[in-house]
């Protein structure tokens, strides 16, 4: 579901959000963004 990547992919403070984006793409979303260290799919 939409928030399935929040727990799986924690976001680092700086830099590489590739893990979040990859998780979101695998879940069928366009991309992943980080908000307060949490991965959100859009």
From Swiss-Prot:
Keyword Repeat: no
Highest taxon of the lineage: Eukaryota
Keywords: Disulfide bond, Ion channel impairing toxin, Knottin, Neurotoxin, Potassium channel impairing toxin, Secreted, Toxin, Voltage-gated potassium channel impairing toxin
Tissues/organs with expression: Expressed by the venom gland.
InterPro entries to which the protein is assigned, alphabetical: Ergtoxin (IPR012622), Scorpion_toxin-like_sf (IPR036574)
Family: Belongs to the ergtoxin family. Gamma-KTx 3 subfamily.
Protein name: Potassium channel toxin gamma-KTx 3.4
């Amino acid at each position: 579901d939409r928030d399935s990547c929040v727990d799986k992919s924690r976001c680092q403070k700086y830099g590489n959000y590739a893990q979040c984006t990859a998780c979101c793409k695998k879940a069928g979303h366009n991309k992943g963004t980080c908000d307060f260290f949490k991965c959100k799919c859009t």
